[in-house]
C-alpha cells in the first residue's frame, strides 16, 4: 500500500518541481546525463569527473594542446544554472556548451556540482561553490594537496583565474567574487575576471520595464531555495541593490562581462547591475553584451543558432 506521505505534495514550483511530504523531490526540467570524454571528443577536448569533497564534485575540461607539455592556460571555475534546484555539470546542455567554449577559448574549466535545493537549501550552494574555488586555488601553493589534479598543476595559469555562470550560476559567480573581496583564497590567489550570463537577480521593487507577472516565478523560486533568507527577496545574495548590500566596488576581479537577452525576464536587472558596477567606483573594466530577440538560456536550447555562436565567441574572447 502506498503511504499517504509519499503522494502528498507539500510545495511545488511549477513547471520545475514538486516536493512531497516524505521529502521526495520530483524534478521535471532536468536535461539528460552526458558522460565525460576522457579520450577527447571531436574537437579534441578532454573531460573527466572528480570528487573535491565527499559532498562536492566537478567536471573538468582540458582543450587540445600543442606538443609543449608546459603550456599554461587560463582557468574558469564555472557554476551551472537551474534556479539552484535543477541541472548539473553532467547534463547534456551544460556539457555541450562547455565543450564548445573550451575548444574555442583554450581554457581549463572546472564545472562545479554544488548541492541543490530544496534538499540542501541555500546558502549550501554558495558554501559548496566557495569550497570548490578554494580547492582550485590550493593548486597555487607549495603545500602538497592530497587531492590535487594534474591538469591544474601542469597546465593552470593562476594569474588568469576566472569565475563564470549562467542564470543562478551567474548569481553564484557574483556572490563568490564579492566574498573573495573579504576572504582570502589559498596562495593569495586573485580572480582575474568574472562573466555573468543572464544573471538571476531579483527584488521587491520593480526596475525598468519589469512586470509583476515576470517576477512571480523568480520570487517563488528564491523563497523555495532559500526559505530562511533574511530580508526574503531583498536579501543581498539575490538583490545586490537592496538596502544593506555591500558596495559593488568590492567585487574582487579586474574584468567583468555581463550578458543579457532582450526577451529574458532577467534583462532589466542585468542592465541595472552593469550600470551599478560602473557607478560604484570599481576600478576594473566592465562590458555589457546585449542579445536581441532571444529569451532566457537561448544558447543552451538553440545551440547552433548564430546568436548562440556569437555569445560563445564573445565569451571566448573575454576568457582568452
Locate predicted features.
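Alpha/beta-hydrolase superfamily serine-hydrolase fold, recognizing
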Residues: 2-320
